Amino acid sequence: MELVFIRHGFSEWNAKNLFTGWRDVNLTERGVEEAKTAGKKLLDKGYEFDIAFTSVLTRAIKTCNIVLEESHQLWIPQVKNWRLNERHYGALQGLDKKATAEQYGDEQVHIWRRSYDISPPDLDPQDPNSAHNDRRYANIPSDVVPNAENLKLTLERALPFWEDQIAPAMLSGKRVLVVAHGNSLRALAKHIIGISDAEIMDFEIPTGQPLVLKLDDKLNYVEHYYL
């Protein structure tokens, strides 16, 4: 069976080189075109889906809608869940990446961005931009809502959604599309493929390009490739 991952199209803060994380930003025109191209590729290759999973962030939701519209499948059920959100970049969210490197040093910022188990500084829960003050997370216990994450923590919160929603859907015979974010998809790919903690640091998923993971009937990894 096949599972298709798509990272959201190029966003406004991708274009501005800002740390985004859980901040809710829109797609750029480039991002919209990337999503349209992805949908057309899926249509041309004959990919049909029974259900789509995405995050609760606008850039992923819009990408999912565009992909499904272009592939003539906008009618299928979509499940939105915070566990597919991007990695939470803590106090770095909204900061310019280059300026942050100049302030803290390239090495420190590299550790925050690329280390598997070291998180950036926490975002104050009282900050106006904190997820604690966003009603889309109102039903999540406050001690579960992150203030900063590394990739390890991103996997730990995404994995229950894989086990409770995505994997059962696939095992029941449903054809699944997941439209999410660079780090939430990298985290799930690490689990599915069996990528080591060291190797995952160099595993990148480009914006708007369908990544196909081939699995056997027990969801064991076989191979992966881009369309």
Swiss-Prot record:
Source organism superkingdom: Bacteria
Q: What is this protein called?
A: 2,3-bisphosphoglycerate-dependent phosphoglycerate mutase
Known role: Catalyzes the interconversion of 2-phosphoglycerate and 3-phosphoglycerate.
Task: Name its GO BP terms in alphabetical order.
Answer: gluconeogenesis; glycolytic process
Under Gene Ontology molecular function, one entry of this record is:
phosphoglycerate mutase activity
One Pfam family hit: His_Phos_1
Biological source species = Haemophilus influenzae (strain ATCC 51907 / DSM 11121 / KW20 / Rd)
Q: Which reaction does it catalyse?
A: (2R)-2-phosphoglycerate = (2R)-3-phosphoglycerate
The entry's family comment says: Belongs to the phosphoglycerate mutase family. BPG-dependent PGAM subfamily.
Q: Which UniProt keywords apply?
A: Gluconeogenesis, Glycolysis, Isomerase
Q: Does the keyword Isomerase apply?
A: yes
Per the UniProt record, the site (Transition state stabilizer) maps to H181
- The entry's substrate-binding residues are 7-14, 20-21, 59, 86-89, 97, 113-114, 182-183
Active-site residues, record numbering mapped to chain: H8, E86
Write down the HAMAP family for this protein, in alphabetical order.
PGAM_GpmA
Q: What class of enzyme is it?
A: isomerase
Its pathway is: Carbohydrate degradation; glycolysis; pyruvate from D-glyceraldehyde 3-phosphate: step 3/5
The Enzyme Commission number assigned here is 5.4.2.11
Whether Disulfide bond counts among this entry's keywords is no
Q: How does it assemble?
A: Homodimer.
> Organism classification, top ranks?
Bacteria, Pseudomonadati, Pseudomonadota, Gammaproteobacteria, Pasteurellales
InterPro entries recorded for this chain?
Answer: His_Pase_superF_clade-1, His_PPase_superfam, Phosphogly_mut1
